[in-house]
């Protein structure tokens, strides 16, 4: 009776490390929700800032229609936005590829009996669960890098009042969506990890 009540969610005894559990769908669904939230965030921020600059232009003083805006006619800020977008794409996909390769190598070192995943609800081994967690983290990092560059372009759009920033924003949003986790992609990852051992 002297044992305190323990929260099963934080108790180390609640889940044995070597017990099978989890499924592909448990790793896919949260990633899809996060992807939707990231895309929605970028689109909402961009729409609000776009409406802000359009509203500002409509309320401008009609006596001075040719008054220069901050950075108006200048290509420095659009150039910065495009370079940031290209850099973010390169970093996001290179980092994701590196993390994927590292996760697969770690899986191959720790898993003694490779697991074939029959269905999306099949129970995963601890090593396969860790592979899926690492894959989830790599995808999220890549998506967040792209989101940051997209928000930066939205802010630059307000600073220089130039809608050319919508082009890199659209490309970056497409990059976020391309990384959307699916059961097929996770099964392919598992197949790649178990093949060519």
Regions found by a protein language model. Give the residues of each.
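Low-complexity, intrinsically disordered extramembrane tails and loops of integral membrane proteins
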Residues: 1-24, 117-121, 194-197
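Membrane-water interface of transmembrane alpha-helices
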Residues: 90-115
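Membrane-helix interface motif
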Residues: 43-62
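Alpha-helical transmembrane segments and their immediate juxtamembrane interface regions
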Residues: 161-197
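Alpha-helical transmembrane segments
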Residues: 72-90
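Select subsegments of transmembrane alpha-helices in polytopic membrane proteins
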Residues: 32-41, 136-146
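Hydrophobic, membrane-inserted alpha-helices
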Residues: 146-156, 171-173
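Short membrane-interface loop/juxtamembrane segments of multi-pass integral membrane proteins
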Residues: 111-145
């Amino acid at each position: 009776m002297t044992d305190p009540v323990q929260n099963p969610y934080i108790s180390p005894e609640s889940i044995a490390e070597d017990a099978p559990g989890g499924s592909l769908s448990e790793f896919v669904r949260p990633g899809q929700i996060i992807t939707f939230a990231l895309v929605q965030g970028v689109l909402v921020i961009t729409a609000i800032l776009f409406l802000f600059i359009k509203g500002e232009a409509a309320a401008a003083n009609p006596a001075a229609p040719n008054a220069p805006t901050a950075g108006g006619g200048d290509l420095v800020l659009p150039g910065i936005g495009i370079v940031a977008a290209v850099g973010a794409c390169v970093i996001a996909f290179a980092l994701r590829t590196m993390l994927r390769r590292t996760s697969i190598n770690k899986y191959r070192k720790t898993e003694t009996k490779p697991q074939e995943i029959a269905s999306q609800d099949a129970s995963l081994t601890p090593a396969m669960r860790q592979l899926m967690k690492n894959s989830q983290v790599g995808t999220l990092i890549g998506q967040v890098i792209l989101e940051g560059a997209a928000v930066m372009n939205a802010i630059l759009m307000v600073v220089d009042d130039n809608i050319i920033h919508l082009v890199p924003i659209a490309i970056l949003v497409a990059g976020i969506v391309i990384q959307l986790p699916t059961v097929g992609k996770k099964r392919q990852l598992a197949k790649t990890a178990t093949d060519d051992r």
